[in-house]
Amino acid sequence: MTDLGPLHYFLGIEITSLPDGYRLSQQRYTLDLLARSGLTDTRTAATSMELHLQLRASDGTPLPDPSRYRHLVGSLVYLAVTRPDISHAVHILSQFVSAPTSVHYAHLLRVLRYLRGTPSRSLFYSRRSSLQL
């Protein structure tokens, strides 16, 4: 076994060692996701989801090809590992992967616009705090 030095990047997660703790980020993954979805030059959203939003399976018209919706939701599920601020929105949107509609897709785009405005958000684990629950 070979020591490769300090950990900087693992499974798409960027790890930065700071004097007072560790920062875990997926900024590169976020920017790549935005580029793949074609949302690099759009306006941003202040929140990932509207307050008190109630989505139903019957909202909107069915998407002709739901694979793009499924792919983007899957990418957001992985991104939520280091972005708990989107986890609720991703949870709601993932309920409709079997039959997404135009309304669901519009709300998915809102999450992506939110990420466009906050690509550098990350988790911070302090060296001084206990990791016990």
Where in this protein do the model-derived segments appear?
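Long, low-complexity, charge-biased intrinsically disordered regions
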Residues: 1-133
